[in-house]
Amino acid sequence: MRLALCLGAILLAAASAAPAQDFPRRPIRFVVPLPPGGSPDLTARTISSGLSGPWQQQIVVDNRPGAHHNLAAEIVARSNPDGYTWLLTTDNILTVNPHIEKVSFDPFKDFTPVTQHARILFLLVVHPSVPAKSVQELVALAKARPGALNYGSSGNGSPQHLGTSMLQYYAGIQMLHVPYKGAAPAINDLLPGRIQVWIGAANSLLPHIKDGRVRLLAAASSKRSPLLPDTPTIAESGYPGYALDIWLGVTMPANVPAPIVAKVSAGIAQVLNVPEVKAKLAPQGVDIETTSPQALARLIRDDYERWGKIIKAAGIKGD
């Protein structure tokens, strides 16, 4: 009897491992919720090119922007749980959007976490016409003239909107929100001073900081960036607890077999945790940080709860 039980356990373990040993046997679809060219797309293509060779299968990046990234999420949530459809998961999809708009997916039940793989540096800048050279000076200016300063975002509920709303909440200030349809048109209005305050991705701001068209005040992340080690964070500038840590990860549909999840998670970590890859992505404000599936699941849960409180307190609504 014991021999039969042992043999059964061995066969069950072998059957569970088999999907991962044979995986992948056909091309993989990697759905990205943004257009080509930005930092998230760059990380997806780095993963794709890094794994396609060793796995001897194409990983096809499929850019599906739209509906605040929800379109891509819906595609993946409805896919077969066989490991052949991945979602480049921006943090807002699962932790912000469900709080501010109606979504057709459950952030906890409809996805399998695979790995967090990067953080994107966001910066607080002002137009040079704004007489503030630090976060403290900006806050003092905003307090002296409530509602006189304006700030841009790429839309209601966007990282820019959330990050600036969080600053207003922590600092007790009020600025006028000017939402745009995307970051590019907002930055086009920031450069001539039509909008005055902006929290946005470093890769889109660094050239303008360098040529003096915008003034850098602080990093919005929880800790200083190696890319800008002398730039203080907003938290260091008098607002402990402030953190706009924009992360990227990979998820799949719910119920993907654990051995496949483990293989994909390990493969992504192997591709990205290479000094040359990190050096290539760092100037774009991309900090590689890979985690286990379990750690990503905890991050999604924690950020969902944190953003829920901030969104409620700040009265943030979707479009």
What is the meaning of each model-derived region?
Residues 1-6:
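Bacterial N-terminal signal peptides that target proteins for export
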Residues 25-27, 169-170, 210, 233-236, ...:
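An extracytoplasmic/periplasmic, membrane-proximal ligand-sensing/linker region
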Residues 42, 46, 50, 71, ...:
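Extracytoplasmic/secreted proteins, especially bacterial periplasmic and envelope-associated proteins
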Residues 78-84, 91, 98-185, 234, ...:
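Hinge/capping helix and adjacent helix->loop/strand transition within the periplasmic-binding protein
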Residues 92-102, 161, 168-170, 197-231, ...:
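A ligand-binding cleft/hinge motif common to bilobed small-molecule-binding domains
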